[in-house]
Curated annotation (Swiss-Prot):
Residues 669-689 have a biased composition (Basic and acidic residues). This is Clustered mitochondria protein homolog. Belongs to the CLU family. The lineage of its organism: Eukaryota, Fungi, Dikarya, Ascomycota, Pezizomycotina. May associate with the eukaryotic translation initiation factor 3 (eIF-3) complex. GO terms for biological process: intracellular distribution of mitochondria; mitochondrion organization. Residues 382-626 form the Clu domain. GO terms for molecular function: mRNA binding. Its main location: cytoplasm.
Amino acid sequence: MAQTNGDMEHSKGWSGHFADFSTAQFRRPRSVCSSDETNGSFFLLQRLPKPNQSNSPPMVNRLKDSRKRRAAVVCRIRDTRDGWFSALVLSSLTSSVIGLFQISVKLPHEPYKIQVMVSSQEQVQDVRQSIVELPGTFQYTCFHLEFNGKRINDFVELSEVEGLKADSEIVLVEDPYTEKEARMHMVRIRDLVGAAGDRSDNLHGLNAGLSLHDAVTAEAAADDVKEHSLSKYDITASPSLETILPRVEAPLPKTVKSISLSAWNPPPYHLRQKGHLLYLQVTTNEGEQFQITSHVSGFYVNKCSNHKFDPLPRTTPKKVSAHSLLTLISKLSPSFNSAFEALQESNNKKDLLTTFPFQNAIPNSPWLVTPPSSNPNSHQADITRSQESYLVSGVDNAETLRDWNEEFQTTRELPRETVQDRVFRERLTSKLFADYNEAAARGAVLVARGEVAPLNPTEDRDAQIFVYNNIFYSFGADGVGTFVSEGGDEAARVAVGKDVLGIKAVNQLDINGLFTPGTVVVDYLGKRIVGQSIVPGIFKQREPGEHQIDYGGVEGKDVVATHPDFVSVFEKMSKALRIKKHPVWDKEGKRHELEGSVETKGLLGTDGRKYVLDLYRVTPLDVTWQEEPGSEDYPHRMSVLRLELVEAYWRSKMSQYVKAEVERRRAAKAQEEAANKEQSSEVTESKEQESEEKAEEALDQERVDISGFQLALNPDVCSGQVPQTEEEKKQWAEDEKEVRDACEFLRSKVIPELIQDLHDGDVGFPMDGQSLSQLLHKRGINIRYLGKLAQLSKEKGSRLEALTTLLVQEMIARAFKHIANRYLRNVPAPFVASCVAHLLNCLLGADVNPNPSAEIDASLREIYPEGDFSFEKVTPETLRAEVEKQVTVRYRYTLEAEWFASLRHLQVLRDIAIKLGLQLGARDYAFTKAQLPAKVPVANGVNGASHDEGKKKKKKGGDSKSPSRAVVEEKPVISIVPDDIVNVVPLVKDASPRSSLAEEALEAGRISLMQNQKQLGQELILESLSLHEQIYGILHPEVAKLYHQLSMLYYQTDEKEAAVELARKAVIVTERTLGVDSADTILAYLNLSLFEHASGNTKAALVYIKHAMDLWKIIYGSNHPDSITTMNNAAVMLQHLKQYSDSRKWFEASLAVCESLFGKQSINTATILFQLAQALALDQDSKGAVGKMRDAYNIFLNQLGPNDRNTKEAETWLEQLTQNAVSIAKHAKDIQARRLRRINMNPRVTTLGTKVQPQVGQTAPEASGAKGAANASMDSRSIDELLKFIEGGDATSSRSKQKKRAAASNPKLRGSKKSSA
């Protein structure tokens, strides 16, 4: 996206996207409001004109004068299909500034007139869309609007409609239908009345986009009187898989039995001439079947039956017709209206975000789903499922065929001068990439399944190419020998993955005049498939002597092409990516100057555009890795540095340059001042001179000119280039040294720093393979360094035992993925489940069955004589050996002898399922003999599949009817059967760029907050939120991140209600886009719990903590380092509820984890001992309180010394507790009685005692919004207050004092550089 800052004036937008089947055109940013409070209202964000302040950044300038006039409002936004929801969005408060006014819309049917709030800058089609979405006007889809008797063009702005002003009346006029409009109308009505049923496709898996938020919230709201949710919670209990499964819900009210196309379609020619479009069949709840004609004038009941064709209007007994199918059905079915209202009410109970349709992102498909056997009736007959392709796309599917490449490039060529231009351009770009990614992934699945005919069927399978839906597909394998010297198929597979990352980086740069093809990489069933938009001219046969490529290496490195038109655009790209301009030599030794790597190619398309291709080498090779012992065994030579590492190296070098420049200036200034001092006799002004020096030095530092700093890396060093002259060799050696320095920077600085940060507890700890990979990539560390990280982690001892476990687990899971992909690549589709199940049994189920055998249908196998069934020969021993070999070769790490005995089976299974795209049926999997049920009849090899005795009985009863029952019972026990592999979903890697405009606003907001301009910073972040929602849509991972950040901002500014609302949205969007059990989802739930507690809703907060802890058990297990903070928060919340006994249990659990990780003499442990001592005092255990406080005091004394604030405070507490211990014991009974009467716990203890949970890789100060983490005191309560409370006294104090002491919270629990293991 464009990096330039533009004016922010007159930009407009709407807070979210709404699906519109009937509008094929992409709409410009909308800004529409409805004033009808009963029907909800739409609020817009209207950007205000920029004040003329030249010294401030443009984004800051724009909001300087407007910030007092902006407010966050809670408004109701609705979607036509899913009801209403409350969302925090922005509203400009002055309609005079934003051009808002109200108009009336006259309707042909009830309610005959509605009021709509509009903006003069929005388009007429946006008004259309708001009409379509209002409950009273659901039925209208085919209409136009008129004003003063004249038709208004849908694509003009309201300001262009002559005479239109406030309180004007426009008229809705129903249009005649076309066949397409009639089809769209039917699809929409089926959605509205809940008759659409489940749509199944090959891209979205089962329960795609699942959210559990509503179910968890329902548990929190179930009974306010009952005991808290943690009362019987067992921290050490085994994880329950039901935590991540959708809850059983009551079926939605049924409005009609079915709406489908009739068997009489399509209309004969002579009836088409009379306006017949479609024939429909509707069966009402009363059991009556009606044949309906879709006519250009509307819909009417005809005289057809299932056996007789007569599409003329029926006269008796029901002569009914209507322009809308919805109205017609309501006339035909007496029960329809009441059922439809009940359906809407049922939908309204859900948070709309949980059912809102995805638009700019692919929903997450959970790895664990409800097994089909648990609900045999889940798949219902619905003839329209097979008709939907026709309804949406027409007879020949031509309506959905798009010229993807032309769309991408024309979108890039859209104007970007004004902010309004940029908003529209980035919205369109985001939507286009989302549509393309989805279409390309669907096609790739068909290619992988062999359902698309190749263009070159005579070639080898890996060399075949395909075109489907105007997308060009090829395999990520070395079918034509391009990568023979680099590692063959392995190198090709890595190259296409790196290519997507390179294209994504170039897309983000948004260089004017440089174009990239739409690119997606899909991993499915062991195959890697590349889908690209078709570049004009890429298949063109060139004249003899002409190269197929215009810039860069042609067919390898032997022939090099150059073209003057590519120099300028490649120069811009290379400068931004830190690529050095350098020479390369062809096979004849001829020198060519290239701006990028010889592997990066430029193609001049027949459309005149300059395309860049093959961006897998935008960074240099990791030379040090390739020269290490064991490099000859590494699968390929495509091990390059990450872009994040190059950027970090550049920043490090620039920092050194700036420091050297400042030192040089200081030295020069010192010499100058020394000379001046000798000449001057005025000593009295030395102090003033000193202060001037400091000020000038600061200015010098600010004014360091970095234009003299140059750092760029040559991506072609150590890759076979042969310099010819001595000068070239010298320059090449210098380039190679710079690359080696970057590699050394990774090894000697970046990797050790990460290990140290995790050791010291300075950053959020990864929870699973996904969060670990994200953390490494963010730091610029390649996955191949997992082995080195594991070695360094091991050296740190028990403190990083959790990290070592995660690293080893990730290496094993990735090794298994490579092995499984190799077997899956050529396995026939019906045997994929057997293959995966057998490999998993060999890895995870060897304790249950040391000799598992693959379940294969012999008769089915016979029809695949060329299929690869080598997976049958795999045994637990051979698989372990292969895993060990893969880990050694790929990560240069040696697994321990009995590594498989210490595997955390559930966590490994989850990691593998996510990496292979598996969806497993949920049941209690048995991976050890101890987990096997005592004596359970085994059905189809399933062991322990049922959750309760009732289900077992049902299954037993059902199985008894099977003729093969006796044979099935004789099967040996295995952990996983083929039926457990319910589905496999494709894994998609895309090149979608992020919105630079939204990020600019966010960055400006962050800078303002860092400069203590809180109000301005908040305004800018709110601005960024609106831009995020406009550009990405509501359901997108980037939007979830921003909801999280914004909720944290509101929490810190004490706007608790807004913080809770945004945190709730963050939870739902994170669940639906990243997964119901992702690490980000856990953090979202933990922060929501914190905000709910701060709002006084502590019972609900504990429900969210319980859910997060349950998720933690599934994805990591127990005793995660970050769980210390969570358990402490839970304990403090329980104190707030006066559940002192339960509170001390959670402090004790937190202490146990802390001692195991940080040791018994660490500051972390002392901090928790301090809190535990207070909890024991509150629970009337004065003796225990004294003991724990003494332990805390001793640790602080040894670690921090006698003069430290923590040591002194612990000493004071210890003295007071000791003095009062005897009297407390004497009056125990009296204390208890008075405690029940007079306790009034200080709210400060709870609100200020809880801590924000940092995200993975995020520092604790970043999470809490603090600038630094100083040694804060351990508790904001005074000793007198606590002792008064223990003795039954009144411990209340003013809230103003509580807030003043907000900074005095507990020291960080997650680690300290001074603590010792």
